[in-house]
Amino acid sequence: MYPFVSNHPTTHTSYSTMPGFSGLDDKSCSSRYTDSVMNSYPPMGVPGSASIAQFYQQAAAVSAASAGVGVDSLGSACSQLSSSVGGAQSGLPDITRHPWLVTASQSALQKFASTDWMSNPFDRVVCGDFAGPNGCPRRRGRQTYTRFQTLELEKEFHFNHYLTRRRRIEIAHALCLTERQIKIWFQNRRMKLKKELRAVKEINEQARREREEQDKMKNESLKSAQQHHSQKQAQQEHTVVGSQQTSNGGGTGGGTGGSGGAGSGGSSGNLGSHLHHPSIVSQNDLKLGLGGMGVGVGGNLSMMGAQT
């Protein structure tokens, strides 16, 4: 623990010129009291309980004397305190005072006194030297380009997406801009082009997927139509075959009936005179029918020969 060093000068008031204060002397009382109090601290490691008790007793006596009404009692208490402390000072060892400690403490106190420690440290450190609305740093405004500058930069970007240092200096001088502004504009323009190409690629990809889906749906509809047409054609063929089969069966039955009718026509005249067993009758009818057919054929041939 280091001794307390006061940087404030002690104010000495001359009480000799005022009536009633003849017993007080600034040099004999105040200066000796200050020196004795500063030297009354015990060294480190040495408890010094007797000196501490004596110091507190003397401080209590001074406070009681200052609270009293009489000024002479204050002067006597001050003189008694100085004499007692002066006697006790001879028994205490001297405290070593290093000059760099005193200098460091004084510089620290001066720095603390000169600093406005009640203000906000954030405002003092971060926002102290800027002219923002609330003391905070103002954001830098966005660079605006004229129509002519934008047109020239777009023409240059159309031919070259990247500029050399020499070409950048030429454009900067021609358009009254800085190299940094030209560089930043080209960087932003390249990013814009990249985004545009990405958007076009996404649009083309989406259109391709939609076209593939439409082609797939069209192929499926064609396949279903072909299957339906093939099924319908098979049904039509089946109905045609069935109708042909039915027509063939009807013609065969009609031919058999016609031959039977011819035989019965030829033998109709003999049915009344020949009454026999049914089987015999049918055989006779067949014979007669065949005979009638032969007669008819022969008659036709004879008629053709007569005509010729």
From Swiss-Prot:
Give start and end residues of each DNA-binding region: 138-197
Could you list this entry's UniProt keywords, alphabetically sorted: Developmental protein, DNA-binding, Homeobox, Nucleus
Localization, per the record, is: Nucleus
Q: CDD domains in the record, alphabetically? A: homeodomain (cd00086)
GO molecular function terms attached to this record: DNA-binding transcription factor activity; DNA-binding transcription factor activity, RNA polymerase II-specific; RNA polymerase II cis-regulatory region sequence-specific DNA binding
Chain intervals with Basic and acidic residues compositional bias: 207-221
Ranges of Gly residues composition bias in the record: 248-269
Disordered: annotated span: 207-277
User: Which Gene Ontology terms of cellular component type are present?
Assistant: nucleus
Q: Which InterPro entries match?
A: Abdominal-A, Antp_homeobox, HD, HD_metazoa, Homeobox_CS, Homeodomain-like_sf
Q: Please give the SUPFAM superfamilies that the UniProt record associates with this protein.
A: Homeodomain-like
What processes in GO biological process is this protein linked to? anterior/posterior pattern specification; negative regulation of transcription by RNA polymerase II; regulation of DNA-templated transcription
Report whether DNA-binding shows up as a keyword of the record.
yes
The main place the protein resides is nucleus
On the tree of life, the source organism's domain of life is Eukaryota
The answer to whether UniProt assigns keyword Nucleus to this entry is yes
Biased region (Low complexity) positions are 223-247
- Coiled-coil region: none
Q: Which family does it belong to?
A: Belongs to the Antp homeobox family.
Q: What does this protein do?
A: Sequence-specific transcription factor which is part of a developmental regulatory system that provides cells with specific positional identities on the anterior-posterior axis.
What PANTHER family does the annotation carry?
Answer: HOMEOBOX PROTEIN ABDOMINAL-A, HOMEOBOX PROTEIN HOX
Q: What is this protein called?
A: Homeobox protein abdominal-A homolog
State the organism of origin: Anopheles gambiae (African malaria mosquito)
Give the taxonomic lineage as stored in the record: Eukaryota, Metazoa, Ecdysozoa, Arthropoda, Hexapoda
